Amino acid sequence: MTDKRKDGSGKLLYCSFCGKSQHEVRKLIAGPSVYICDECVDLCNDIIREEIKEVAPHRERSALPTPHEIRTHLDDYVIGQEQAKKVLAVAVYNHYKRLRNGDTSNGVELGKSNILLTGPTGSGKTLLAETLARLLDVPFTMADATTLTEAGYVGEDVENIIQKLLQKCDYDVQKAQRGIVYIDEIDKISRKSDNPSITRDVSGEGVQQALLKLIEGTVAAVPPQGGRKHPQQEFLQVDTSKILFICGGAFAGLDKVIANRVETGSGIGFGATVKAKSDKASEGELLSQVEPEDLIKFGLIPEFIGRLPVVATLNELSEEALVQILKEPKNALTKQYQALFNLEGVDLEFRDEALNAIARKAMARKTGARGLRSIVEAALLDTMYDLPSMEDVEKVVIDESVIAGQSKPLLIYGKPEAQASGE
């Protein structure tokens, strides 16, 4: 390596690539009859990085997991919902297989299959979408349908969803086009009424209309810094036909719509089959029978439903399932709090009756798995506040009375003989 000075021959040295002299650059690296400056080295590194980015998607496509592998991975993080996991595994596999084969197979154009998840709050809709994105190593973003409005009205534009996806992958368009978008609370943008109104429904049917093209597939022009505040910026062209859209919602009341259809179809009169009240299907059984006509009656427009051909229904979680969620998944809530306490050098034990009490409390609140953390947090708050200031605590035990708020966690101290001798 030569420094910014003349070599032994007294000649001024120049970069063999850009022609700059040794005085115009910070470093000049010498080889056999050739020189390269630090600026050209940086440029070469940039070119290599760009090529690696272009090759990376091909590596991802060649390692596409099978539906069985996708289902197995979901089982590690999501308890229950077996049918929904199977539907998702097949839909996701087919979507990325379509991308790998360039949207066509033997001259047949492969259609896009977006997904609609229906099920009560806390049943695992968001977790399923997040887990899929992690498994496939693709960009993932979430949007709340209740914040969206038609373009030109106060609120979040539909195109901002793609903006968020681009932000997740540092504005790499190719990477964003392989991403997953989860739109939550999709049931909240149902049409407010079957009758046309003088006032425009900008947050209901209007948003459904705005989402149509985005979900079906269009080339969206998205400014790199968001919004329409900087019209002079160069827009990024994103093909949304390659993005997988998953829409989810609780659809409260949809079971009644389905029940009306099912019961009406049973007929009336002398030849009708009379059903006892005990024969009525549960909410979960009814939701599993959902048809497009039910969603239309609920308030989604036919064109929007047509863009979501794959429908998966998640059931309300039972007490047993909630207990499993508390202790079985890889990132189970009890394991997370035990890891936190271990950082203080303390063991944390949840007794079985405590886990059942947590599950019953979540069911009473109708928050599903989403409400489990707040219940555990409330039970452990005082202990987590005091523990860092306490000495010789070896173990904390949580039983049913702690969850019910009737007593404090049991603290087990170590070194009793040392404490006795100190007294």
UniProtKB/Swiss-Prot annotation:
Indicate the segments forming the ClpX-type ZB domain, all copies.
Answer: 2-56
Instruction: Spell out the Pfam families in the cross-references.
Output: AAA_2, ClpB_D2-small, zf-C4_ClpX
Q: How does it assemble?
A: Component of the ClpX-ClpP complex. Forms a hexameric ring that, in the presence of ATP, binds to fourteen ClpP subunits assembled into a disk-like structure with a central cavity, resembling the structure of eukaryotic proteasomes.
Sequence positions that bind Zn(2+)? C15, C18, C37, C40
What InterPro entries would the database entry show? AAA+_ATPase (IPR003593), ATP-dep_Clp_protease_ClpX (IPR050052), ATPase_AAA_core (IPR003959), Clp_ATPase_C (IPR019489), Clp_protease_ATP-bd_su_ClpX (IPR004487), ClpX_bact (IPR046425), P-loop_NTPase (IPR027417), Znf_CppX_C4 (IPR010603)
The identity of this protein, by name, is: ATP-dependent Clp protease ATP-binding subunit ClpX
Q: Look up the record and report any one GO term of the cellular component aspect.
A: HslUV protease complex
Q: Which PROSITE patterns match?
A: CLPX_ZB (PS51902)
Q: Which domain of life is it from?
A: Bacteria
Question: What Gene Ontology biological process does one annotation of this record name?
Answer: proteolysis involved in protein catabolic process
Is rRNA-binding one of the keywords UniProt gives this record?
no
Instruction: State a single Gene Ontology molecular function.
Output: unfolded protein binding
Keywords (alphabetical) are: ATP-binding, Chaperone, Metal-binding, Nucleotide-binding, Zinc
Q: What does this protein do?
A: ATP-dependent specificity component of the Clp protease. It directs the protease to specific substrates. Can perform chaperone functions in the absence of ClpP.
Q: Which CDD domains match?
A: RecA-like_ClpX
Residue positions annotated to bind ATP are P120, T121, G122, S123, G124, K125, T126, L127
Q: Which source organism?
A: Salmonella typhi
